Every structure is written in structure tokens, then in C-alpha cells.
Amino acid sequence: MSEEKNLPTKYQPTEIEAGRYQKWLDQDLFKPSGDKKAKPYSIVIPPPNVTGKLHLGHAWDTTLQDMIIRQKRMQGFDTLWLPGMDHAGIATQAKVEEKLAQQGISRYDLGREKFVDQVWEWKEEYASHIREQWAKMGLSLDYSRERFTLDEGLSEAVRKVFVSLYEKDLIYRGEYIINWDPKAKTALSDIEVIHKDIEGAFYHMSYPLSDGSGVVEIATTRPETMLGDTAIAVHPEDERYQELIGKTVVLPLVDKEIPIIADDYVDMEFGTGVVKITPAHDPNDFEVGNRHDLPRVNVMNEDGTMNELAGKYEGMDRFAARKAIVSDLKELGRLIKIETMNHSVGHSERTGVVVEPRLSTQWFVKMGPLAEKAMKNQETEDAVEFYPPRFNQTFLRWMENVHDWVISRQLWWGHQIPAWYHKETGEMYVGMEEPADSENWVQDSDVLDTWFSSALWPFSTMGWPNEASEDYQRYFPTSTLVTGYDIIFFWVSRMIFQSLEFTGERPFQNVLIHGLIRDEQGRKMSKSLGNGIDPMDVIEKYGADALRWFLSNGSAPGQDVRFSYEKMDASWNFINKIWNASRFVIMNVEGMTAADIDFSGEKTVADRWILTRLNETVARVTELFDRFEFGEAGRQLYNFIWDDFCDWYIEMSKEILYGDNEAAKQTTRSILVYTLDQILRLLHPIMPFVTEEIWEKIPHQGESLVVAEYPVVHEEFNDEAAARGMEVLKEVIRSVRNIRAEVNTPLSKPITLLIKTNDTEVEEFLTANTSYLERFCNPEELVISREIEAPELAMSAVLTGAELFLPLAGLINIEEEIARLEKELDKWTKEVKRVQGKLSNERFVSNAPDEVVEAERAKEKDYLEKQEAVKERIAQLRSI
């Protein structure tokens, strides 16, 4: 055999994966085939933010997409997997501002234009890092079509959509309560707000009635906003306060009268049943204020400090003002009590500060008509299909309850809003291009929410608004979107309604929703916990294929997956098993070419069985891939490869390979190569590097496994009789191995093997295949008959259609074996006692790290199982 056909003795992923990706790129294998007769299949990558490194969640997300696209490519589809990245507005701007702050520079020092130049430099650097990570993962992306959400083509699409929605009265400018980040000084979308449970307080205060007839008790968590109160409210049906409705109270510290109003919003059962109404600082109060025509008093600046309407508290930070106001209320005798409590408080995802509900003039998308169209589409044949289906209800519920979408951001990095204001008249103009006399106009300084442009991703990347674009005509709507359940509302939903509005089509046929990657203890990975895993570190240690196998094998639609290094070890071991099996095949087919593969001649039962099992595996895996049930597909592949091919067929093939029948050798060699070839094709979408490496070393046709034909079922290979017979044969061999282990007898020691069966098919099959029984069971006497009497001194096993007996006379000394097992039992009993002593020690359980305690519990379980198994063996021997 020539040197280049050998596989190295050891599987070393780093050496195998190095250079392979570039070779694929050089061969131009990731672009669409261009075959107009082929059915198109397209995926657009969920664009990662250009903010830094990709995390394990990205690795999972992109692995699933790559698996789908690689399989479809092999199945003959005209595939496009389009890469791209998201400018990620606030996230990227915050990173660059942080970097500049380390040099003592603010964005205001640079000015808008120079600051944006700095962000573009950041984008180029991190886009390069992301591409390197994609390459390490082996992602078969068509880089010739790579897009960025601030590309000119995509920017044109953004302007077109904005102007069109504005002209349809679906975009408007108005004053509303929005999420405000006082540090970044910008509005935030709901997804940019992270809710954390923190310790806070309910401050109970008394507001005196203006007529001096008493006081009303109010409770709030934000006393600093009371300076902006313009009413207090009770429920119209609350009998306790009927006589108060229409009266006024004096607002403490401000000394102004505000009305007592009645509104259904008030919960009679909560607190005192009286609430303060601050329309400029609370979204619910804003709605109440609109219903009752209340003034809106905004007492805070953009940076979270108190403004001139806050009186003596002007200039104070909002939390410092809270302390001062509480102190002053106490001094006035208006503070009744303070109750400590835990409550959920919104924090900015990017800056970490507490988000302030704030009255602000912003741009909004009117969601009602758009949501209605999206919901109606889900009742048609063109509905987007969710995997798992329960997320369709999640989508519909969100659409039913959706609020208008605030789309303006007070940032410099992003799509600047295409609206201009006349310098003299204040007239507003909205259009695709700036006004002709641009010197007389000033453009709106705000930019659009990142999600506005990413909502257009599936069609803007294909050339829209140029609907004559070749890619748009060929690949839109796309076939499948793969994404996590955490952004179904904020991205998936918006893509659906924008696509329906502007193209009249759903953006994708299927949405595969996966869960989150968690650590071994089930916790979400986060910086604060320090439990994040860099996928590049995992690849460095185990290789990309092992990581991809783990990610695919733990994948069920909608479910979370737990990462552990133990699972990574198992992934590596599986690939190593494939590697060693491939080395065996390659060494035994020396000199063979693809043209030599021929198994049309007589086949052994093992040959017929492995081809039948291959057919079953191909059918099942293909079906499971179509349903996106990759975890189950992985289990099917694992069982077929590890058990059927490696542990059974390869071992059985040795009888032929090491024999003298040349015709049988040719058939078995051909089936070994063919089955391995089909295995590599089935595995290639999941573990592309190692499969390509091995495939190049076996007899094959074609330039690359990337574009090789995916396996299909060959009905002529099915042999149910061989499959049934082999299952019985395997049962016999497994049972004999188990009995040998139980009585501590090695394979080298011959046995008497008696097989009793009343099943003619089983009897004929076993009788015709005694050579396998002789090889794997080493019997000095083998009897297969209907007339066997159970020996007195024997171990037995009941099988499918048969019963076997293994006489122990002369094989073992039962008393000696019992004595040996009793010593082993004593050992496990002591181990159980030791570990249970540890676990019953409260100090150990309380003080030891969780992982140490869990390890001891795992030991206890293991020792108890071993103790029980030995007890059973002793009882079995004593019963003979």
C-alpha cells in the first residue's frame, strides 16, 4: 500500500483539520451548484454581532445550520448558505466607547464622523475574527455573498422600508414611555433589558387631603418619581374610597394639589388600593394619564440626574435623590414605613445600569396591522412551520399582545433615520434621499434599532428591493431558519411580519428553535458566573468534529443542552473508534480501487445483515434529519457504527479476510469499503473534517465528500431473514460472554454450549452459522437441538426463540468462586459504608463544594449497584 493511503496510527484532530477548510474554499465547494434543474435550498445565517468572539451558543446554532446545508448539498439540492454580520448598534458602540474611555477619550471629543470611523475599524477587526472562527468550525458558507447590515444594499432596503411604512402611516413620531439607559443615553428595545431580582423597598407615604379631612396612604418603590406625580388613583368600585373620588391631595415636598381619580387599572387587592400616577415615568401611568388628560411632568435628565422640575433635588443622581426624598419625608412626618422586598428590576444589557422608564419623543412602528397580517398567514398553507410546533403558539400569543415598537435610538452607530427637519420652518421630510436643498435641512440624529435592519435580513441579503435580482428570484423565500428560543419575539416575529408586508411571502418555510447551552449543573453560561466556554478552546483540545458531534448529538428541537468535558471525551472516543475501524478497513483493502468494489456474488449472513442494517440506518437518519431531530439521528448513527459495524461486522469479517476463499474475500472487502463509504457520507454533515480525511484514503470516486451523493435506501439489500437470524446469533454470543464474565472464565477456556430451540428458523440459522459461534464462544462441544434437557449444574439464558445452557462441571469450582465473590462483596460493602458515612456528615455536605458532594453521591450509587450485582451472582451460584 502506498504511503499516502495509510491513516496515521493515532487520531490527531489538529493535524487533520489544518488546511482542510482552505482546500474546500480553493475547490469552490460551498457555492450553489448553479444547476437550474435542482431544487433550491437556502439558509441565511443569523448574523452575529461584530462585538467580539463567538460563544458556544453560536457554535451550536451554526453547527446545526451547517449539518442541514451539507446534507441538502449532498442530496443534490442547489444550496445557498449566506453568511453575514450585524452592526449591533448599542452593543458595538458601547464596546468602542469603552475602549476609547481607557484612553481618556469620549465619543463627543471625536465627533460623530470620526467616532463612526473608529467603529468601522472595530468592525473590520472583529469581522475577521468571526470568519476565522467560522473556518475553525468548518462552516460551508458562500463567502462571495457575505453581507453586513450596514452594507449599501441593505441600507437601501432599510430606507425603503422606513419610508414605505411612514407613507402607510405605520411609522409615526410620538411621545411615549420607553426603556431608557441613563449611561448610554438611549432608548432600549425590550430585548436589551435584562430583568434581575434585587433587594428593594416599598416606601409607604401619606398624602394629606387638601380639605384637611385626613390622609391617603401610598406605597411606591421609586419615591424619587413622586415629584412628577399628577394624580393619585383608586378603583371606581372600591367602596373604601368612593367619597374621595374628585377630591384633591397635596403632593408632599412639592406643595401642589393633584386630583384623586378613579380608574380600572388600580388593583383593589394590592397594597392600600391607592396608587400614585406619574405619567412621565411609568408606562401604565402614562396610559392612565392619557385617559384622564393628566399633565406629564418629567423630573429627570437623560443621564438619570434630577432636572429643574425636581426643585431642590436638581442635579442629584436619581438614587441619591431617592435617599434625600425619603429622609425629607421622614422629617415631615410623611413616611409611614419602609418594607424590604425582592423585586424584578430592568437593567441595560449593555451597560448594566438600572433602566429608567422615561417619557421621550421617539419613532414607533404601529404594530396592530402588521401583527394581524402575520397571524392570519399562520392560518394558511404558507404558514411558517415551527419546530417544535409549540412555538407557533408562543409566536401567536406575542403577536396578539404586541405593543407599538420603538425603533429610534440615541446612538451614532447604525442606520440614521431618513427624516430631515427644515432649519427655519421645522417642517419634516421623510424620503429615500436627502432633500434637494440639503443645506436648509438637518437630518434626524437618531439611528434605527438594530432589529429594524435585521428584520429585513432574509430578503435584503438576496437583493431586495431589486426583486429582479437572481438570488432573490432563486433563493427567496429561504428554506429554514435556525435560532434560539430567546429571540423568537424580537427577531423571528419581526422578520415574519416585515417579509409578509414587503414581499408578500413568508421569509422562511421552517424555523428550527433550539434551546440554550448550559453548564454541567444546568446553569445558564454567563460572565458573572464565570462558567462560559470558548468553543475555540474546545476545538484546540478535541477538534471541531468532536465539538460538532457533541452539539448535534445533544440536540432536540426546543431543548437546552448541558456542556461537559466528560461528554467531549465521549465524542472524541467515538471519532477515535471510527478512525481505528477505518484503519482496519484500509489495511485490508490494499490495492483496491473504486472500480473493484463488487459484492454481487455470494454473501455471508453477516454481509447480508450489515447491508440490511445500513439500509435501516439510512432511512431512519434521513427521516430524522428532515424533522430536525438531530440528537436521535446521532444515536441511530452511533449504534450502527459502534455496535453493528465496529463491534460485530468487522469482527465477523475477519473469519473471511483471514481465510482462503478469494471470492468471499472480494465480497467482504467490497462490503467493508462500501459500508464505510456510506458511514462517512452519513456522518459528513456532522463531522466534515475527519470524514473527508478518511474518505480520501479509501477507494472512492469524486473530488470531495462535500459534494458526494448522500446515501439512499437500496431495497435489494434488505434481507429480513438474515437480520432476524443475526439478532439471535448476537444474543447467543452476548449471553455466553455475560456468563463467562459472571463465573470469571476467560474466552481462552473452552466450554460446552447447549442451545435448545423449538423454532425451525432459529435452529436452521444457528446450525448454518456455527463458525461464528465457534469463533466468538470457543465451545469444545456445541449442540443445537430440540431435545436438550437442562443440566443440573449449569448457567442458562432465555433468548428469542431459544434457551442456552452452559454446564459448569469442570469449568469452575463453585465453592472457590463463591469465596472469591464474597471477598469482592466485602470490598464493596466497605466502600458503601465509607461513602455513606461521608454523606451523612452534615458538615461535609454543607461545606464541601457542590461538585465534590455530587461526586460522592455518584460513587455511592456506583458502589451500591456493584454490591447488588455481586450478591445476585453469589445467590445464583448457590442455587445451582
From Swiss-Prot:
GO molecular function, one term: ATP binding
UniProt-listed Pfam families: Anticodon_1, tRNA-synt_1, Val_tRNA-synt_C
Xref: PANTHER family: VALINE--TRNA LIGASE, CHLOROPLASTIC_MITOCHONDRIAL 2, VALYL-TRNA SYNTHETASES
Domain commentary: ValRS has two distinct active sites: one for aminoacylation and one for editing. The misactivated threonine is translocated from the active site to the editing site. The C-terminal coiled-coil domain is crucial for aminoacylation activity.
Enzyme class per UniProt: ligase
Coiled-coil regions, chain positions: 808-879
Compartment list: Cytoplasm
NCBIfam families: PRK05729.1 (NF004349), valS (TIGR00422)
Name of the protein described by the UniProt record: Valine--tRNA ligase
Catalyzed reactions per annotation: tRNA(Val) + L-valine + ATP = L-valyl-tRNA(Val) + AMP + diphosphate
Keywords: Aminoacyl-tRNA synthetase, ATP-binding, Coiled coil, Cytoplasm, Ligase, Nucleotide-binding, Protein biosynthesis
Entry GO terms, CC: cytosol
Any single GO BP term: valyl-tRNA aminoacylation
SUPFAM superfamilies per UniProt: Anticodon-binding domain of a subclass of class I aminoacyl-tRNA synthetases, Nucleotidylyl transferase, tRNA-binding arm, ValRS/IleRS/LeuRS editing domain
Quaternary structure, from the entry: Monomer.
EC identifiers of the protein: 6.1.1.9
Keyword Transmembrane listed: no
Signal peptide: none
Residue interval(s) of motif 'HIGH' region: 48-58
Binding sites annotated in the UniProt record for ATP: K527
Job of this protein: Catalyzes the attachment of valine to tRNA(Val). As ValRS can inadvertently accommodate and process structurally similar amino acids such as threonine, to avoid such errors, it has a 'posttransfer' editing activity that hydrolyzes mischarged Thr-tRNA(Val) in a tRNA-dependent manner.
Major localization class: cytoplasm
Superkingdom per UniProt: Bacteria
InterPro entries: aa-tRNA-synth_I_CS (IPR001412), aa-tRNA-synth_Ia (IPR002300), Anticodon_Ia_Val (IPR033705), M/V/L/I-tRNA-synth_anticd-bd (IPR013155), Rossmann-like_a/b/a_fold (IPR014729), tRNA-bd_arm (IPR010978), tRNAsynth_Ia_anticodon-bd (IPR009080), Val-tRNA_synth_C_sf (IPR037118)
